[in-house]
């Protein structure tokens, strides 16, 4: 009986340790980002380098909109590449605590960043029924990225 009681107590303590997990504080709106993400002591923090998209059409002329695609296409590709990278480390989008999205102004949008296109891609990976965890996130427009015609680079920080 003592062994059973000890096992139950140890199991309960394990559950309590699991409860001391990452806390995501809502921003108080329906917008799918966290206001603050709190990472308790004892968690491992990962700083992932920025990722850019793969060419949408490698047969097109490099640097053209056809080669890279629009902002939504590039963001989808970038998120897919991040997912592949995270998979190799046994991490996933649920571990993302913070994100910075760099968008180049789209010539087809008068030089303004296509925030809606990026959000259409982002919303497929974050705040879904399958993956409800939301990161703290900033999105900024930049003058350019490393590859001519690239419109998207995304950097994530994770905790597990």
Task: Place the predicted regions along the sequence by residue.
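N-terminal presequence-like segments and the immediate start of the first folded domain
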Residues: 3-9, 13-80, 84-97, 106-160
């Amino acid at each position: 009986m003592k062994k059973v009681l000890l096992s139950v107590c140890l199991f309960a303590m394990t559950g309590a340790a699991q409860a001391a997990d990452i806390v995501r504080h809502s921003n108080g709106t329906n917008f799918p980002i966290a206001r603050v993400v709190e990472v308790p002591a004892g968690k491992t923090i990962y700083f992932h380098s920025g990722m850019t998209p793969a060419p949408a059409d490698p047969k097109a002329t490099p640097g053209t909109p056809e080669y890279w695609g629009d902002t939504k296409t590039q963001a989808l590709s970038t998120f897919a590449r991040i997912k592949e990278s995270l998979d190799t480390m046994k991490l996933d989008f649920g571990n993302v605590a913070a994100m910075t999205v760099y968008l180049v102004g789209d010539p087809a949008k008068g030089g303004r960043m296509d925030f809606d296109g990026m959000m259409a891609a982002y919303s497929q990976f974050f705040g879904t029924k399958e993956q409800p965890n939301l990161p703290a996130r900033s999105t900024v427009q930049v003058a350019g990225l490393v590859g001519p015609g690239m419109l998207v680079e995304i950097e994530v920080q994770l905790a597990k």
